[in-house]
């Protein structure tokens, strides 16, 4: 099954491709829409994932997959939330520094990564799946692997950040992995819709 990857984010593509490829699902990444054309006006991760997937499916008349993800920190919930990528407005490193600064006098450092995956068909049909990864915010930036908030996020049961644990651990345990697992569990329903309804 071929699905358009509805994002320009190379890191997300690599992570999702490694998870989906063994299941005979091929991500097509050479389909691009100027991000300025897609207004992520949703108030939830699910809504924004649906907006992106629907835009690509409609433009290219093909099934599209999109994700919207971020981190929710209990002490300042619902932030950074859907604003995770642009929390500081100055990129990943400054986002992380801002979080550490906001939490410096707070005991509660619990946090969770959230990922919403949306599969959209050109006819408007959409399937959505959510995954979470629980953990805590570190006291300092640690590790150079990964991207986003990985250098300050310590998964439950670990002492290292995702930035230290690396891609092998993340591929198996991340919020994106959990969301994609939920998608894969429902894969037959999606394939049936593709074969017997949309392609009819």
Swiss-Prot record:
GO-annotated biological processes: nucleotide metabolic process; purine nucleoside triphosphate catabolic process
Catalytic activity line of the entry: XTP + H2O = XMP + diphosphate + H(+); dITP + H2O = dIMP + diphosphate + H(+); ITP + H2O = IMP + diphosphate + H(+)
Gene Ontology cellular-component terms listed: cytosol
Cofactor: Mg(2+)
Key words of the record: Hydrolase, Magnesium, Metal-binding, Nucleotide metabolism, Nucleotide-binding
InterPro entries noted in UniProt: dITP/XTP_pyrophosphatase (IPR020922), ITPase-like_fam (IPR029001), RdgB/HAM1 (IPR002637)
Note accompanying the cofactor annotation: Binds 1 Mg(2+) ion per subunit.
Pfam families per record: Ham1p_like
A molecular-function term among this protein's GO annotations: dITP diphosphatase activity
Coiled-coil regions listed in the entry: none
Record-listed E.C. numbers: 3.6.1.66
Binding site for substrate: 7-12, 69, 147-150, 170, 175-176
The keyword Disulfide bond is annotated on this UniProt entry: no
Subunit structure: Homodimer.
PANTHER family given in the database record: INOSINE TRIPHOSPHATE PYROPHOSPHATASE, INOSINE TRIPHOSPHATE PYROPHOSPHATASE/HAM1 PROTEIN
Protein task: Pyrophosphatase that catalyzes the hydrolysis of nucleoside triphosphates to their monophosphate derivatives, with a high preference for the non-canonical purine nucleotides XTP (xanthosine triphosphate), dITP (deoxyinosine triphosphate) and ITP. Seems to function as a house-cleaning enzyme that removes non-canonical purine nucleotides from the nucleotide pool, thus preventing their incorporation into DNA/RNA and avoiding chromosomal lesions.
HAMAP family xref list: Non_canon_purine_NTPase
Designated name of the protein: dITP/XTP pyrophosphatase
Organism: Acholeplasma laidlawii (strain PG-8A)
């Amino acid at each position: 099954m071929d699905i358009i990857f509805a994002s320009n984010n190379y890191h997300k593509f690599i992570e999702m491709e490694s998870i989906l490829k063994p299941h005979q699902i091929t991500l097509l990444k050479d389909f691009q829409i100027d991000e300025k054309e897609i207004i992520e006006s949703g108030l939830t991760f699910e809504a924004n994932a649906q907006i992106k997937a629907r835009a690509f499916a409609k433009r290219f008349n093909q099934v599209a997959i999109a994700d919207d993800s971020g981190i929710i920190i209990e002490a300042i919930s619902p932030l950074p939330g859907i604003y995770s990528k642009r929390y500081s407005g100055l990129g990943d490193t400054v986002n992380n520094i801002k979080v550490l600064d906001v939490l410096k006098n707070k005991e509660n450092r619990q946090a969770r990564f959230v990922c919403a995956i949306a599969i959209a068909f050109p006819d408007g049909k959409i399937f959505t799946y959510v995954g979470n990864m629980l953990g805590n915010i570190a006291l300092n930036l640690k590790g150079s692997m990964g991207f986003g908030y990985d250098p300050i996020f310590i998964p439950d049961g670990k002492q290292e950040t995702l930035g230290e644990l690396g891609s092998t651990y993340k591929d198996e345990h991340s919020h994106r992995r959990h969301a994609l697992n939920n998608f894969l569990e429902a894969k037959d329903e999606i394939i049936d819709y593709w074969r017997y309804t949309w392609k009819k």
